Structure formats: C-alpha cells, structure tokens
Amino acid sequence: MTDLSRYRNIGIFAHVDAGKTTTTERILKLTGKIHKIGEVHDGAATTDFMEQEQERGITIQSAATTCFWKDHRFNIIDTPGHVDFTIEVYRSLKVLDGGIGVFCGSGGVEPQSETNWRYANDSEVARIIYVNKLDRVGADFYRVVKQIRDVLGAYPLVMTLPIGREESFIGVVELLTRKAWIWDDSGDPMKYEVKDVPAEMADEVEKWRAELVEKAVEQDDEVMEKYLEGEEPDVDTLKRLIRKGTIKLDFFPTYCGSSFKNKGVQLVLDAVVDYLPDPTEVKPQPEVDLEGHETGEFAIVDPDRPLRALAFKIMDDRYGALTFLRLYSGRLEKGTTVLNTATGKTERIGRIVEMHANQRNELDSAQAGDIVAVLGMKNVQTGHTLCDPDKPATLEPMVFPDPVISIAVTPKDKAANEKMGIALGKMVQEDPSFHVETDQESGETILKGMGELHLDIKVDILKRTHGVEVNVGKPQVAYRETITRRVEDEYVHKKQTGGSGQYAKINYVIEPGEPGSGFVFESTVTGGNVPREFWPAVEKGFRSMLGKGVLAGYPCVDFKVNLTDGGFHAVDSSAIAFEIAAQAAFRQSVPKAAPQLLEPIMKVDVFTPDAHVGDVIGDLNRRRGMIKSQEAGVTGVRIKAEVPLSEMFGYIGDLRTMTSGRGQFSMEFSHYMPCPKNVADEVIKEAQERAARK
C-alpha cells in the first residue's frame, strides 16, 4: 500500500474545448500508463471511452484512472465540461482532494469554466491552474491570468511564463528556479533542455518572481519579517509556503503550456506532487444520522479506523455493473461483507479493481484514500455509504437537482419494450439527475433530464449500448403550478350505504407558501373536533393531489394548508374518509385561490464575437430573456441573461448561425417564475388537447 502522504486524488476540469482530455492523455503518457497517445480529434483518447464521447469529442463520464509520478500515486477523475453534465463534475468534486483547472490560452475563462470553478469553491477543493493551447493563434497567457483574477475573483500565483507566442511557443520559464525549459519540435515530451532564462526575458522573469515570493511569504510571519529585512527565502521554503497557501485556497499556482505539442505538462505533474493536498490534509467528511443531520463524528482518513466509503458513480459495462467507491477510512477486502446504510442491507465484496479508463487491474484490498471500483454490487446507488456492519455510520449524501426538461419515448419495435425498461433502469442507477416515469394515462415512457444534450445522449446510449431504437417526442418543459390567493373554506364528505358509512368535515385555509417551500401542512384544530389521529390523513389527502395541478396538470408547489376546524362521527369517521375529504377540498378550493403557472428560468451565459453582439442580444430579448450583464473581452463579449427554458430549445444551432459558428453558451437552472398570461394560456390549451387525446 502506498503511504497516504503520497496519494493525490485529483480531478481535471475545464470548458468543453480547453484541452482537458488531451491533457489527461499526456499525463498518462508521461506517467508511463499508455504508449501511443490518443487524440480527441480522431476519437481515440483513453479516458473518452463511451462511443458518444468519442464521436462528440466531449467527455461525458468521469473515468477514474490510476497512475504514478515521482513515487506518488495519482487517482485522476476526468470530468466533463459541458453544462448538461455538470452533475458529473459536482459528483467528482465530492470525492476529490485537489484539482487542475485547465483554461484555453485563446478562449480564456469561458462560461462553463466559471460554473465548474464555482462548484469547486463550494466544495473547497484546492487547485492548480494550467493555461493550455499557448501554441494557438490568439493565445495570450497574460490575458487569461487577468481574466482569472477579474472573472473568477481568484488569485493565480504565476509559476511559469511562456517563451515565445502562438506558433513560436517553444517552452516555459520556471520562476522558482529561474530556469528555461525548451522543447524541440519532435512532439516528444522528453526531448527538452533546461537552460538559463533568455536575456530578453530577464526583467519580466524577475518582476513575476518577486510577485510570487511576496505572495508566498504572507503564509509565514517569520519568513515574511526576514524577507522584509532583505533575506530571500530558499526554494524549499518557498515550496512549503506555496503548498500551505494552495491548500488554504489563498491562491492557485498557475502554469502554462501546450498539451497537444507536449510542452509544459511535466511541470504541472510536479505541481500536483508539490502543492496539492494528500487525503489527510483536507477536511474530513462529516458523518450524518438517518435524517441527514450531522452527528459531530467525522470519517478520518486512516486505514485502521472502521470502514467508511462513498459510492460516487455506477457504470454498466461489458463486465457488469461497476460501483466506484472513494474510501474515506478503513480497509476494503475481497470476500468481506459491508453494510449499505441507505438500504440497511449487507453486500458482499466480490472483485475489487483499480481502473485505468476502461481497462482494469484486480486488487485483493484497498485502503482509506483509494478510489476503486467493485464489480457486481446489487443494491448500491450513487450517494450510498458502505461501512463496517459492526460500526455503522452514514456519510453526508449527495444532493442532485431536479430535472427541468422531459421527452416521451416509445420503442420503434414494440417487442423491445421490456429491453428498454431494463436498459433505462440501469441508466437511472448510473445517473441520479436522469429520471424515468410512465405517464399513467397514455402509458408513454417519459425521460427527464438537465438539458437537451443530456437527453440526446441518453437516447443515443439506448440505441448504441442497449440496441433499442426509440421514437422521440418533442421536448416538454417542467412547468409548475402554485396559488396566489388565500382561501378559507370547508368541505363535508358523507357517504351512506348499508352498514357503517363515511363521514368527515374539514375547515381549512389554503394560501401561497414561501418560494421554494414546497408543501407545508399544519393543524390549529382545538377542542377535539377533528381527533389528532385523523390529521395525518388530511395531510396525506392534500399531498396526494399536489402532483396534478388544476390548470394544466403540472405539480403544485409553494402551497400551505392549515386545518382549522371540522367535525367527525364516532362510527362513520375514519382516516380514509378524512383523506377523501381533503382530496375533494383541494379540487374545490384551488380554483378559487387564483392558480398560476410557473416556468423554469435558466441562467444563460453566452460568448459571442464583437461583430454579432447586437444580433445575440436582440435574439435573447425576443426569447423573453432579461440581460443581466455584458462584459467585453479581447476576443468577444460575454452576455449573462435569464431566459425561460421554453424559449431555449435548439438555441445552439441558432447561436452558431448568428455568430458564424463562433458563439458558445452554457445554461443552468436558476429559479421558477410566473408565466406571462399569453404563454400560460398556450400551455394550458396544449395540456387540455393532450388530455382530450388520451
């Protein structure tokens, strides 16, 4: 087993085209894991191993890869850059100790880089920054450094400077050692020379080095005092201080290079060893009780403590189901039994494997700090905790956002219905942000996800991986309904047949709840007019109606009910009578409470060349968008807006047309807002027509 201080669990995250997968490939080549480097643009990269990824050139699934550099063990999680897969980024950040943020030397801080950066800040993940593609036309390292400061509000601690620009980029100057690394044109990462700094760069190097030293010495008062008295700290002291500041997130060591041309990647690997934390140097995971409240205990990273492991990804491949685990404490051994705290059931550990993209090495055991996959687990889902059955505990679970878009699918071949059901069951296990439901009335299968591309990929996986071709309906928006007026009302349910009948009377108030509150029920009944044992039945009755609002059948949210009074009959009253009364009361009173349709509003971040700004803003306005800000950069303008999801279908094609293929955008859910009357009327009309057809 590797000593824990030599572990680095890291993620590589970036915008779609910043060169993240290429960078991962170069790391694997340098660490001796692969012999021929795969290029993304010919669909052969090692970590992009789903067909959909290789075809689209974007990374969808976090492939876990283990490799070694300078006697340190790297577990690398390759994360996707497209916004519809942000769930994968969030999921991998949960299990990482550090990260490499890759930025494009010409594109700079692009919309998705900002989203991923924000997630990493929320997860308190220490990072180093790598500005890639400096061989590209228009690449400018110094501009990207300024953008990182201005747009991300982060402090990039510049560690290397580029030698040459664009096609004449030949290497980097390492500021700490004042040495120049210069590669030849062979493309071999090992063919480089370490020389003195080029004379024409000497002043620039000293300026940036002084800034580096001044920032580093702030980490230690004693070193700072000596520095102010004129004593320069040695390189080892500076490295110690940079490590301390990086782990505290005070700054982010920043490197430059070109992964495609194999220039500069070694220094990034050295930085992972020198500055990113080992598993014992990050905050331990809190343990929680069954209700999700913290117990005050922590999963300390120590192989000798009881087992605590988090299942952070489920994947199905040709060998069966793979469950990826991050071990926080204890050991996991082949043939032993562990407890899944989410299900209360035990699982036997069969084969443990260390993953290298889609290849694997079998292991007999794993320890705290490891990221491994286990084959053949039956009832484990993403976010479940596996622990020692004799000393159970639950780790803080992952929280996933609700889907905002849905499509109906039917198999082209009716005989494939069962096959589709099995395939979708596996896909839901693999991706908690993907939901599958059956429309009770039409019998159609409804897929729900985080965006158009997310669902496109799912349909593709059905076809390629599972051999099920489907007909796809047009995308549907996840509207919601609410009420806007307080209504005081009563309802009496009476049913008399032979024998005992049914009787329940309820007096109640329904009113709008706080935004985001969902459904709130309370009872202020006094004097026993509605016995306490029937209150839960009243709540259950109202709650059972929330799934289908009165306007267009969409779920009802932000809805408050207060049971104020009522009446009962000693013989005829029962829980079921009160439940039926509450259901009828919902149907009676909600139409009086000025019901309103709500629509999902998306945060949209668009990048466009200067020449097309007017067209893009005009188009967003036509889509009922509200422009929040626009920011001029060197290569174009970033526009941030809030736009209803219903207006954003097919936007990527329209944006490319408007900007001659150069525009980019990212989009994520923001909040729900009331629909304008004309939109609401149209949605309600469509819903009524759909209902009439069923």
UniProtKB/Swiss-Prot annotation:
SMART domains: EFG_C, EFG_IV
Compartments in which it is found: Cytoplasm
Keywords from the UniProt entry: Cytoplasm, Elongation factor, GTP-binding, Nucleotide-binding, Protein biosynthesis
GO cellular component, one term: cytoplasm
Residue numbers binding GTP: 14-21, 78-82, 132-135
Family annotation (InterPro entries): EFG_II (IPR041095), EFG_III (IPR009022), EFG_III/V (IPR035647), EFG_IV (IPR047872), EFG_V (IPR035649), EFG_V-like (IPR000640), EFTu-like_2 (IPR004161), G_TR_CS (IPR031157)
Function (record text): Catalyzes the GTP-dependent ribosomal translocation step during translation elongation. During this step, the ribosome changes from the pre-translocational (PRE) to the post-translocational (POST) state as the newly formed A-site-bound peptidyl-tRNA and P-site-bound deacylated tRNA move to the P and E sites, respectively. Catalyzes the coordinated movement of the two tRNA molecules, the mRNA and conformational changes in the ribosome.
Family: Belongs to the TRAFAC class translation factor GTPase superfamily. Classic translation factor GTPase family. EF-G/EF-2 subfamily.
PANTHER family linked to this entry: ELONGATION FACTOR G 1 (PTHR43261:SF5), TRANSLATION ELONGATION FACTOR G-RELATED (PTHR43261)
Protein's UniProt name: Elongation factor G 1
Species: Methylococcus capsulatus (strain ATCC 33009 / NCIMB 11132 / Bath)
Encoding gene per record: fusA1
